[in-house]
């Protein structure tokens, strides 16, 4: 089976790396060559049995339209784009959505525990996508667009927004002699707890306890920063959640 990955960004680079580690050769094609001004309507891409589009959502339709391979299996890797992005000229199509945070700077070596959400146009396509996903992980779930969109939103809260909280925490420590590394055991313990208990049950802190004296003191310290309003909103949300 010949595989071509279209897009050499964070997702494409990691997929290429992961497949290579598992003995599967895949050719990586840079998206720039497919979306550059003056690029031909039908791109010259290597022939393949499977095309994996690791392309940003805003450019996906453009790249899909430029690939002329009606017999191949076409897969996108997006959590929010529908399978219908592949038109009738691509009858074999689906989704291969690995639910992980990817970056080109840190390539992932261990894929076996990464969830993969798949969708296909028919039973045969689903079977082929499942077999491909199995080369990397055993945690494979069929998921339509409705479910993928919601898991994508959940992932943004759990990953992207939590990472923003780390950056804010780092900023709050500026002007002190305390390094961000002092927070790492706390961060690790918080993540470890949700492996064995519900997030609601793992919640701690002054907002859960209804300790308004501490909350108000923190708001006073934060009043000259951009974070006071966010702190107050989060404290109110936690307080409401735990007053039920």
Q: What is the predicted function of each stretch?
A:
Residues 188-244:
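Interdomain hinge/lid region at the active-site interface
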Residues 3-19, 210:
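Glycine-rich adenosine-cofactor-binding loop
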Residues 9, 32-34, 122:
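Residues in the short beta-alpha loop(s) of Rossmann-like NAD(P)-binding domains
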Residues 15-17, 33-108:
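Rossmann-like NAD(P)(H) cofactor-binding subdomain of soluble oxidoreductases
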